[in-house]
């Protein structure tokens, strides 16, 4: 994939659609997991976690999805998305993720920055950084 703003936006649109389907129980977790590279770095105010295997990434994503389901998650509206192509092999995607339940009520609103890298496996997320509050 040639990294340009439109290609990265399109890839993330597909990623969020896959994430939403999995979080609602309508999607296949293996489809979601193909969006993540390993190692995968996750950082937030709670600290830094480096996931070194596919199984570790799967467990973390399952934990996140379980938490969203407990809140009646239905979908995410990405507010103010920004894409910055860093070079031929990587790009940043940043947006505020308005997470809504089936009634359209927002229950979470983190701002998240993703680093996506393009290698022989295609574009994959290498870092997820949740902005502090």
What are these regions (language model features)?
Residues 29-81:
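A solvent-exposed, acidic/Ser-Thr-rich amphipathic alpha-helical stretch
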Residues 75, 86-97:
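A short hydrophobic beta-strand element
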Residues 99-107:
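Short, cysteine-centered beta-strand-loop-beta hairpins and adjacent loop/turn segments enriched
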Residues 106-133:
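Short beta-strand edge/turn micro-motifs at domain boundaries
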Residues 18, 47-49, 99:
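Short histidine/acidic/glycine/proline-rich micro-motifs that form metal-
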Residues 12-19, 36, 57-64, 97, ...:
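Hydrophobic alpha-helical core bundles mediating ligand binding, dimerization, or RNAP-core interactions
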Residues 1-35:
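Short, low-complexity N-terminal intrinsically disordered segments enriched in polar/charged residues
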